[in-house]
Amino acid sequence: MSEHEGPRATGFDTLTLHAGQQPDPVTGARATPIYQSASFVFPDSDFAAGLFNIERAGHVYSRLSNPTNAVLEERLSALEGGVGAIATASGQAAMHLAVATLCSAGDHIVASRSLYGGTHNLLEYTLPRFGIETTFVDPRSVEAFRSAITPSTKLLFGEILGNPGLEVLDLSALAEVAHDAGMPLVVDSTFATPYLCKPIEHGADIVVHSATKFLSGHGIVIGGLLVDGGTFDWETSERFPTLTQPYEGFHDLVFAEEFGPLAFITRARKEGIRDFGACMAPTTAFHVLQGIETLPLRMQRHVENTRRVVAFLDEHEAVESVLYPELDSHPDRELASRLLPKGAGAVFSFNIKGGRGAGRAFIEALSLFSHLANIGDAKSLVIHPASTTHHRMSPDALASAGIGEGLVRLSIGLEDPGDLIEDLGRGLRRSQRG
C-alpha cells in the first residue's frame, strides 16, 4: 500500500479530492500539509541504507521527493490511470525529463509540428546541441509519423490539442504506429486535462502536463507533471539501453528488470530529477492540489463559456475563421467528439480580418481579457502567437503550423459569458476601423 494512498474510490470527482491522501495521522489535519523541509530524518542506519539503495519507500531530500509532492503525484497518476508520476518545476521540465530519460546523443524524435512554442524550441534548437534530433510532421497525418521513424527514433510526441491551431491528435492510431515500431507515444495533455481526455486509455504511454494551466487553474504557480502509464514493455524493445542495460550510477542496476512497469518513472526520478534538479517546490504542489480539487467544476464552466464565445465569433463579420474542434468547419470534429466527449477545451484561435494590424488593435481594445502569455487561468486571456509565444519560429515553420499574422489565441475563463462577448465585440469593432 502506498504511503499516501487515500480511500479506494474510483469516481473522477472523488479522486480529485481524495486520491493519494488521508488525514494526517498525528494532527488530524484534513488538508494536505505543506512539508517545507529540505531533508528528512532517518530512524536508523538500516532505514537510510534502504532508501539510498531503492529498497524501500520514503523521503531523503526534497529534490528527489517530498510528502506534499507525493500526494500530488499520486493524485494525478490516479486521475490519468497511470502507475506513477513526478512533479517538476515546470511543464518544460517535465517534457525535458521525459526526453532525457529515454534519449541519448545520436537519438531521434518524431513530433507534431503544431506545438507550444517553448516545446518547439526545445526540440528544434536546444536538444540538437546534445545530439538529439527531431523531425516535425503534420499532426493529422499518421502516415507522416510512420514514415519519419528511423532506427534511432525513441518516441513519438504530440499535443492532444495542437497549439495554437487546435489540431486533434489521433491517439489510438499513433499509439499503434509507435508500438509497432517498438517505441512509446508521449503526449502533452495540458489543454485537455484528465477531465476531458485520458490519453493512456487511448494508447499513450507517457503523459506530460504543464500544471501551471488548468490543473492549478488560477495563474499563480509554475509547475509540471510527468505521468507514466506503465503500459510500455521496455524489456522487449531494443531501443532503450537506459532502461534495459546495467546503470553504473546504481551499481549496474537494470531498471526494466528490477521495476518492470515502473522502470521509466523510477529512472526519471532516481537519475533525472536527482541530476537535473528540476523539482517542484512543496508550496507549489499544495497550490496545484487545491486547483485539482475543483477541476471538474471549473472545466465544465470553461467549456460552457467557450462554446458561447465560439458561437459568437463564428458568426461575426470581422472574423475570417474560428479554429475550434467542435465546429462543423473544423476538420477534426469527428475525432474530437470521440476523444473529447465532454468538450474540446477552453483554448482556441481565430483569424481576424486585417492581419497583424487588426489583431493588435483588437487586443489593445479589450478590457476584460488579459493580454499575457499563459492559458488555463480562471480569468480570460488573449495573445497574438506570431509576435509572442511563437515569434522564434521561422516564417516557414509558422506557415507549416498554420500561424498567420491575423491569428489570435483566446483562453476562456470563468467570467459571465455575456461580459466576455461584449468585450470581444468591442475589440472587433475597433479592429476594423482601419
Question: What are these model-predicted stretches?
Answer:
Residues 276-279, 284-285, 290, 294, ...:
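Conserved small-domain helix->loop->beta segment predominantly found in fold-type I
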Residues 44-96, 118-125:
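Conserved N-terminal alpha-helix of the aminotransferase class I/II PLP-enzyme fold
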Residues 39, 229-232, 352-355:
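Short loop segments at secondary-structure junctions
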Residues 2-66, 74-75:
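N-terminal "arm"/small-domain region of PLP-dependent enzymes with the aminotransferase-like
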Residues 9, 16-35, 357-397:
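C-terminal core of ALDH-fold dehydrogenases
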Residues 227, 349-351, 411-413:
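Short hydrophobic/aromatic beta-strand micro-patches
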